[in-house]
Amino acid sequence: MKDFENYSDRKTIQTRIRFLCFIGAVILLLSGCAVCMRLTPDRTYSAEERRMLSKRPSLTKKSVMSGKFQRKYETYLSEQFPGRTHFVTLRTRLTRLLGEREANGVYFGKDDYLLERYQTQDFDWKQVRKNVKRTASFLKEYPNADVLFVPVKSSALSQKLPMFAQIGGEAQFFDQVRQQAPRQQQIAVEDVLKAHDSEYIYYRTDHHWTTLGAYYAYEAWAKHMGFTPVPKEQFQVMPVTDTFMGTTYAKVRTGGKADTISLYEQSGDSAFSFDYNMGEFQSDSFYDLSKLEGEDPYSVFFGGNQALVDIRRAEEGTNGKTLLLIKDSFGNCFAPFAARHYARTIVVDLRYVNLPISKLLRVYPADDILILYNSVQFMKDTDIHKLK
């Protein structure tokens, strides 16, 4: 009996020791991570996700009382956590082993598609309303301007979503746009893209549309403008990589299937010349093929997001006019199509231009203006106030 009690006591002690060792290891791990975060400079950009990362939020009484500081700090910690990429990969694989159809805001869809999940509560609706109101005011002030919003992959390719998956927020946004913006200045492409949803119009592993998807939107825009779109058959389609793994894949680090990026070229493209960022550098092509070997192959279009690209073309075959294209990254593969109708095309990204469009128009007068954004990126954008 005494031997049993001694054995039981030893087991209890061993269990406590193991528990204390586990607690100690967790504390050491968390302490080590905290020290690493202190000693390691915050990253400003994630090459894997092709986006800016959160900065350490400012601590104020107002931000704490409203809960804004806590939310921002939680996001900051999750994005700056040491070894985050490896943790994301491990967590996602475990999630999939458990049979889950979604991880880290990404649905594992049909046919190797990875589709981002959006819910109504994910958006700052005050910011959304401000952006819609500012854009509607701009359109009323500039009757020569139009707006084209690209739907997210999750809604355009809703048939690829897993069963019972739900997407929220975008429909409410489109309702606001339809109610506030002049109807004749809206170019709706939701139905256009839906009509081609069996084709390769969005990348499987990235949030962007493919060049083919951009072409179908270009057709709709050209008809709206009274132009004859360049027939698809007149382009030489050049696949330049078939190993592209995009931003959506970077969020889960598993699943999906490598994408192909294709460029649409046409005889006469040598007539174009390009000036970047008001004389920073020049080019003779819509494409920077060196980017295919880098971390972001999608940057093959114009070398990535640029503040301002001034595209000129010989007058022959154009309408002799100037187009101002105000866009996010979705406009990068759209611009080469639109530029074929103009003698000059000014491509602007508001995120990198520190002046209002009205001042820019004094330097670059435009006959036509097109605002082209992905719906969700527009909803979250904090630079739309420059549309004035």
What are these regions (language model features)?
Residues 1-388:
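Extracellular glycan-modifying ectodomains
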